[in-house]
C-alpha cells in the first residue's frame, strides 16, 4: 500500500441505506476520467448536478459531483467525490462503472485508510492528525469528539513539535561545544543547559499527563464486576446502566456468561462487564462462564471486587486469587453491596481510603460515590477543556522520550565530561517524540497504523 501510485476509489460513507452515499476517487490526472464519465469538464471546487449513466447510457442516478484539483484537496491529489443517493446497490453500480471507465488509468479499489495515508504522505496532515480522523469517527462520547477535533486541528502536534524544537536548540548548543573543545567553556553553566533541560522535562510530564487522560477518552475503561455468586453484580450493572440489561434472581449462579454494557460517567466511556460468580462448580455451563470471567479479569483496566453481607465463605481468598490474575497496574476496587441489609446502613462505612465502599444496588445508596471513586482510581482528573484524544502508541513514545530525558539529566550532572552522552540522550528523546507525528517512523509501522482505518477514509 505504501508505494501504490495508481488512482483509488471507495465508498466513503458507512455501509447501509442512507439519504446520501459518497463515492470518492483520488489520484493524479483525474480530469481525463471526469471527461469520460460525464462528457464534460467540471469547474474545480463547485458542486455540479449531473446524470450518471451505465454502459448502455441508461440513467443510474442523479448526483452531485465535486472535483478538487490537487494539491488543493484532502489527499493532495486530484479528488472526485460523487454524492449519490445512499442505496447500497446503487453505490455498487456507480463504483462498477467508474472502475470500468477508469481501467485505462489503473483505477483500483482503495485499501483501508489509503486516502488518509495519501494525505499524510503528501503533507496534508501529520500522523497524529491522521489518527485523529479515525478517532473522530470512532468517538464514544461528546468529550472524545471534541478531543479528537482538537487533535485534528493540530493542537497535540503543536505541543509535540514545540517540545522537539526546544530539544533541538539544546542539542545545537551541546554539539557546537563538542565541535570546539578548545574553548574550554563551562557549557552547562553558561548556556543554562540544566535549566533548559528541566523546562523540557516539565513540559514532557504535562504532555504525558494529558495523553493519559486522552487515552481514557478514546478507549474508555474496561471495568469488570467480579465476586462470588449472589453478591449483586448483575444488580449493580443494571443500576449503573440505568436499565435492566442483566437478569437478576435470588438464585446463586444465575449469570452464566458475560454481559457487557457501555455507559458514560462524566463523559468517560465505561465498558462494564458483568461476570459469572466465581466458585467451584460441577455445572458444565456455569464452569464455562467462570472461565470467561477469568478471561475478562485478565484484560481489565479496573476490577470492582464485589462482596455482600450474605456472600459465600472464602471472600478474602477469592480476592487474593483475583489479584494474582490481574494485569500489571490494574487496580482493584473493593465494594460491599447490599448495605441496606446492614444495620445502620452506610453509617458503618469507614472514612479510611483503603476500606471497602458500601453501596446498595437495590436502593441506589452510595452509587454516586462509587462513580466518583471509579473515576479517581482510573486516574481521570475531570479536565475536559483543552483535552485531546491519544493512543497507546503516543503514551509509549512519550514514556520512552521521558526515559531518555531522565538519562540526559544524569549525564548533565557529570558536567562537561559527559556532553557526548548528554547529546545522544537528547537525540533519542527527540526521535521518540518525532514518531508521534510521523517524522521518524518505519514504513511497516505506518502500514499497520493506516490498515486499521475504514475503507474510504
From Swiss-Prot:
Q: Where does Mg(2+) bind?
A: 234, 255
What the entry lists under Pfam families is as follows: MMR_HSR1, MnmE_helical, TrmE_N
Q: Name one GO cellular component term.
A: cytosol
Q: Specify which residues bind (6S)-5-formyl-5,6,7,8-tetrahydrofolate according to the UniProt entry for this protein.
A: 24, 81, 124, 457
Give one GO term, molecular function aspect.
metal ion binding
Entry EC no(s): 3.6.-.-
Record keyword Metal-binding present: yes
Task: Identify which top EC class this enzyme belongs to.
Answer: hydrolase
Give the cofactor binding note.
Binds 1 potassium ion per subunit.
Cofactor(s) annotated in UniProt: K(+)
Q: Which residues bind GTP?
A: 230-235, 249-255, 274-277
Q: Which CDD domains match?
A: trmE (cd04164), TrmE_N (cd14858)
Q: What domain of life does the native source organism fall in?
A: Bacteria
The subcellular localization recorded is:
Cytoplasm
* One GO term (biological process): tRNA methylation
Provide the binding site for K(+).
Answer: 230, 249, 251, 254
Q: Where is the TrmE-type G domain?
A: 220-379
Instruction: Please verify whether the record's keywords include Magnesium.
Output: yes
Report quaternary structure and partners: Homodimer. Heterotetramer of two MnmE and two MnmG subunits.
Role of this protein: Exhibits a very high intrinsic GTPase hydrolysis rate. Involved in the addition of a carboxymethylaminomethyl (cmnm) group at the wobble position (U34) of certain tRNAs, forming tRNA-cmnm(5)s(2)U34.
Q: What protein family is recorded?
A: Belongs to the TRAFAC class TrmE-Era-EngA-EngB-Septin-like GTPase superfamily. TrmE GTPase family.
What's this protein's name? Answer: tRNA modification GTPase MnmE
Q: Which organism is it from?
A: Polynucleobacter asymbioticus (strain DSM 18221 / CIP 109841 / QLW-P1DMWA-1)
Q: List the gene name.
A: mnmE
Amino acid at each position: 500500500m505504501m508505494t501504490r501510485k495508481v488512482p483509488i476509489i471507495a465508498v466513503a460513507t458507512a455501509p447501509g441505506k442512507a439519504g446520501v452515499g459518497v463515492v470518492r476517487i483520488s489520484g493524479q490526472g483525474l480530469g481525463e476520467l471526469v471527461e469520460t464519465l460525464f462528457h464534460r469538464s467540471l469547474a474545480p471546487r463547485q458542486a455540479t448536478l449531473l446524470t450518471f449513466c451505465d454502459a448502455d447510457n441508461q440513467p443510474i442516478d442523479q448526483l452531485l459531483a465535486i472535483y478538487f484539483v490537487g494539491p488543493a484537496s484532502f489527499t493532495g491529489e486530484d479528488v472526485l467525490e460523487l454524492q449519490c443517493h445512499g442505496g447500497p446497490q446503487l453505490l455498487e453500480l456507480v463504483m462498477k462503472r467508474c472502475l470500468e471507465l477508469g481501467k485505462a488509468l489503473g483505477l483500483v479499489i482503495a485499501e483501508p485508510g489509503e486516502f488518509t495515508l495519501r494525505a499524510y504522505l503528501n503533507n496534508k496532515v501529520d500522523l497524529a492528525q491522521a489518527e485523529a480522523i479515525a478517532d473522530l469517527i470512532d468517538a464514544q462520547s461528546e468529550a472524545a469528539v471534541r478531543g479528537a477535533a482538537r487533535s485534528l486541528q493540530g493542537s497535540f502536534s503543536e505541543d509535540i513539535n514545540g517540545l522537539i524544537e526546544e530539544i533541538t536548540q539544546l542539542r545545537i548548543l551541546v554539539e557546537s561545544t563538542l565541535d570546539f573543545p578548545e574553548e574550554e567553556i563551562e557549557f552547562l553553566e553558561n548556556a543554562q543547559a540544566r535549566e533548559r533541560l528541566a523546562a523540557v522535562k516539565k513540559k514532557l510530564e504535562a504532555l504525558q499527563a494529558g495523553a493519559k487522560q486522552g487515552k481514557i477518552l478514546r478507549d474508555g475503561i474496561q471495568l469488570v464486576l467480579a465476586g462470588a455468586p449472589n453478591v449483586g453484580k448483575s444488580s449493580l450493572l443494571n443500576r449503573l446502566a440505568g436499565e435492566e440489561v442483566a437478569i437478576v434472581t435470588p438464585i446463586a449462579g444465575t449469570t452464566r456468561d458475560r454481559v457487557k454494557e457501555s455507559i458514560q460517567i462524566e463523559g468517560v466511556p465505561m465498558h462494564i462487564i458483568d461476570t459469572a460468580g466465581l466458585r467451584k462448580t460441577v455445572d458444565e455451563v456455569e464452569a464455562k462462564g467462570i472461565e470467561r470471567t477469568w478471561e475478562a479479569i485478565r484484560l481489565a483496566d479496573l476490577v470492582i471486587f464485589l462482596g455482600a453481607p450474605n456472600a459465600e465463605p472464602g471472600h478474602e481468598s477469592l480476592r487474593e486469587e483475583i489479584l494474582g490474575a490481574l494485569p500489571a497496574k490494574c487496580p482493584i476496587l473493593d465494594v460491599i453491596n447490599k448495605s441496606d441489609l446492614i444495620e445502620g446502613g452506610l453509617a458503618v462505612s469507614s472514612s479510611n481510603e483503603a476500606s471497602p465502599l458500601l453501596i446498595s444496588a437495590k436502593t441506589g445508596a452510595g452509587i454516586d460515590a462509587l462513580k466518583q471513586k471509579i473515576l479517581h482510581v482510573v486516574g481521570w482528573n475531570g479536565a475536559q477543556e483543552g483535552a485531546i484524544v491519544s493512543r497507546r502508541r503516543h503514551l509509549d513514545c512519550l514514556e520512552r522520550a521521558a526515559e531518555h530525558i531522565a538519562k540526559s539529566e544524569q549525564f548533565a550532572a557529570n558536567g562537561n565530561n559527559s556532553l557526548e552522552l548528554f547529546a545522544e540522550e537528547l537525540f533519542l528523546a527527540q526521535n521518540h517524540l518525532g514518531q508521534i507525528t510521523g517524522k521518524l517512523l518505519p514504513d511497516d509501522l505506518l502500514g499497520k497504523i493506516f490498515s486499521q482505518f475504514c475503507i474510504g477514509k
